[in-house]
Amino acid sequence: MQSQDIISNDTLVNLQEEYDRTQIQEVLNELNQELIGLVPVKTRIREIAALLLIDRLRRKLELVSGNPGLHMSFTGSPGTGKTTVAMKMADILHRLGYIKKGHLLTVTRDDLVGQYIGHTAPKTKEVLKQAMGGVLFIDEAYYLYKADNERDYDSEAIEILLQVMENQRNDLVVIFAGYKDRMEKFYESNPGLSSRVANHVDFPDYTSDELLQIAKMMIEEQQYCFTEEADKTLLEYTERRMKQPYFANARSIRNAIDRARMRQANRIFASGEKVLTKADLVTIEAEDILKSRLFSLPNA
């Protein structure tokens, strides 16, 4: 077909109507409202959504529309929102008609790999059966490959995944997730897998200011509030915690808030006050954070 033949058809499609009908703006708005920062991630998700929407319009005009590669890789530290974004991505794919159900199934190596011969295939196939029509999110996917373990049955799980990713890509989207450096080695060791993953999204660590915003969102959801001094103390706590081992971004902040709530409850209980105001029950004081052992660590 000549280029002039392709563009000569004067059939029109309405982009705005299609955009409104699929209601993907609702999901994109939720991403912006629910997740602090992560600008590169949000931009990448918008780009993928735009491609899929335009692809949908091309199909309406009977233009060639190669099935876009939808399998993805989410890389980044723990607590950077990978699972939350995967849920939103599943919603977008469902609204645009690329998956039938739109659910997200989160698994790890233990859900896919058996401990003895003949156990891995049925486990992996059962997980895939549950995930069909939706998105399969494999967290810490690099644990599926252990080159130094001859008795490991991971390769069988990977082979089954490869077959399904290739042959049933209209029924299932797979997202592999984990630390960036480990995921890169995982793909190097499994070139067949790497070639089937078209979209790579890197999740940056949060800044201390972004983590403070996240903390405020979390306590508002639980109907608590910080005093001005507690605000400053939590920021100092966050900056110290970021330098410590096993820091997990928003996950570590959630844990810190849970402990601050416990200290607040104990402070109120120990005060012996018989009558409490609403303010007493909702206010987190600086001392509720300062009692963290982090402030007693040398060089913390």
From Swiss-Prot:
It is found in: Plastid, Chloroplast. Its main location: plastid. Pfam families: AAA, AAA_lid_6. GO terms for molecular function: ATP binding; ATP hydrolysis activity. Keywords: ATP-binding, Chloroplast, Nucleotide-binding, Plastid. GO terms for cellular component: chloroplast. ATP binds at residues 76-83. InterPro entries: AAA+_ATPase (IPR003593), AAA_lid_6 (IPR041627), ATPase_AAA_core (IPR003959), CbxX/CfqX_mono (IPR000470), CbxX/CfxQ (IPR000641), CbxX/CfxQ_RuBisCO_ESX (IPR050773), P-loop_NTPase (IPR027417). Necessary for the expression of RuBisCO. Belongs to the CbxX/CfxQ family. This is Protein CfxQ homolog.
